[in-house]
UniProtKB/Swiss-Prot annotation:
Topological region Extracellular: 196-440
UniProt biased composition (Polar residues): 124-134, 427-440
Compartments (UniProt record): Cell membrane
Pfam families for the chain: FtsQ_DivIB_C, POTRA_1
Membrane-spanning segments: 175-195
Keyword field: Cell cycle, Cell division, Cell membrane, Membrane, Transmembrane, Transmembrane helix
GO process terms (BP): FtsZ-dependent cytokinesis
Region feature Disordered, mapped onto this chain: 1-97, 123-154, 397-440
Descriptive protein name: Cell division protein DivIB
Length: 440
């Protein structure tokens, strides 16, 4: 009876073991499935899930262990007569416990492996989801990379800044040196090439001094070069000529000299030792100048001392165009007018005036001369003179007709011509005064 009972107990215990093993396998399988699903969907919470799962597994392990102990105690109470069976049952329970411990360790290993798989699945199993949202993920990744690149920029150290500064300075030095070398090379090529030889000399502003004389003073030769030609020496040599007032010389690359001459005007010809010499605007007589070009200069006669200086000043204030109308200036004082002068013009008129006002009044002479009536040959129909000493008036000469008569008819005719000439000249002077007032 005892043997049958022990056999039944062993069979029941084996069945219980099988059920327990099946239960544990099912539970472990379910747990692994849950872990895998959780690992795929909640990969960001792996550490928390692993800790919670470990606690959960530990609780199940303790529950199973308590259950086995209680079952073993009940069997010990039912079969108190058989200590051998109890020992076998204890051994079996111990072995079951050891098996449970082994399974628990194996499950924990599986759990760790599943966690590793979950981590790997984060990169591999989530690929389909990542492929479905490539555009959004790529945008976020690029933004993160840009931010990381910006944040990863580290400030330069002092030594690095010095290195950067040295490199920049070296680049600047190299560029400056290359520019200087090229510039020096160009200058050397120009200096020793035919381009540097003076090939053209342009002279402007010379009316009385001949061009050949200016070229002789400049001293330009066939082998003269631009960089050896001294402008200062040439200017000083040219200004020694009394006719030349000032000189400007400009070098125009590659091989041209521009010479601008400003001359002292010849305002009159003065008799000196039986010869008429040019008188300059600065009051100097031009002696020993046979090659001077004298175009149209009035002849001064009878002036001395301060009156000569005043007349020179008056002529210098006139324009060259007005001076060309004057053929001769004579000092002709009267009792009441010590500054009275007489001018004889190139168009056959005589002008009476005063030294102090003659320069202002003579600027209207071209218009006055054109207003007078002339014949086909250009001579005045009514010969006479213009009085500019006080105001301005035209006074015909008496007896200017072809037949001189003592009758009253001829006297009346002469007076009528004189009045007509005065009216014509006065109308011209009035027009001139109006134009001058408008211009002012």
């Amino acid at each position: 009876m005892m043997d049958d009972k022990t056999k039944n107990d062993q069979q029941e215990s084996n069945e219980d073991k099988d059920e327990l093993e099946l239960f544990t396998r099912n539970t472990s399988k379910k747990r692994r499935q849950r872990k895998r699903s959780k690992a795929t969907h909640f990969s960001n919470q792996n550490k928390d899930d692993t800790s919670q799962q470990a606690d959960f597994d530990e609780e199940i392990y303790l529950i199973n262990k308590d259950f086995k102990k209680e079952q073993g105690n009940e069997e010990n109470n039912d079969s108190a007569s058989s200590h051998a069976n109890d020992n076998n049952i204890d051994d079996s329970t111990d072995s079951n416990i050891e098996n449970e411990d082994y399974r628990y360790n194996q499950e924990t290993d599986d759990q760790n492996e599943s966690n590793g798989i979950a981590v790997d699945n984060e990169q591999h199993q989530s690929a389909p989801n990542e492929q479905n949202s490539d555009s959004n993920d790529e945008e976020t990744v690029t933004k993160k990379e840009r931010k990381s690149k910006v944040t990863q920029l580290k400030p330069l150290t002092l030594e690095e800044k010095r290195k950067v500064r040295r490199k920049r300075q070296k680049r600047i030095q190299y560029s400056v040196i290359t520019i200087l070398v090229l510039l020096i090379a160009v200058i050397l090529i120009y200096m020793f090439s035919p381009l540097s030889k003076i090939a053209h000399v342009n002279i402007n502003g010379n009316n009385h001094v001949s061009t050949s004389k200016i070229n002789k003073v400049l001293g330009v030769k066939n082998d003269s070069r631009m960089y050896t030609f001294s402008k200062k020496n040439a200017i000083n040599d040219l200004e020694e000529d009394p006719l030349i007032k000032s000189v400007e010389i400009h070098k125009q690359l590659p091989n041209t000299l521009n010479v601008d001459i400003t001359e002292n005007e010849i305002i009159a010809l003065v008799k000196y030792k039986g010869k008429y010499l040019p008188l300059l605007e600065n009051g100097k007589l031009l002696k020993g100048s046979n090659d001077v070009k004298i175009n149209d200069a009035p002849v001064m006669d009878g002036f001395k001392g301060t009156k000569e200086d005043d007349m020179i000043k008056a002529l210098s204030e006139m324009t060259p165009e007005v001076r060309r109308y004057i053929a001769e200036v004579t000092y002709a004082p009267s009792k009441n007018k010590q500054s009275r002068i007489e001018l004889f013009t190139t168009d056959g008129l005589q002008v009476i005036g005063d030294i102090s006002t003659i320069s202002k009044k003579m600027k209207y002479y071209p218009q006055m001369s054109q207003s007078l009536a002339r014949d086909s040959s250009g001579k005045l129909k009514t010969r006479g003179y213009i009085d500019l000493s006080v105001g301005a008036s035209f006074i015909p000469y008496r007896g200017n007709t072809s037949t001189q008569s003592e009758s009253d008819k001829n006297v009346t005719k002469s007076s009528q011509e004189e009045n007509q000439a005065k009216e014509e000249l006065q109308s011209v002077l009035n027009k001139i005064n109006k134009q001058s007032s408008k211009n002012n």
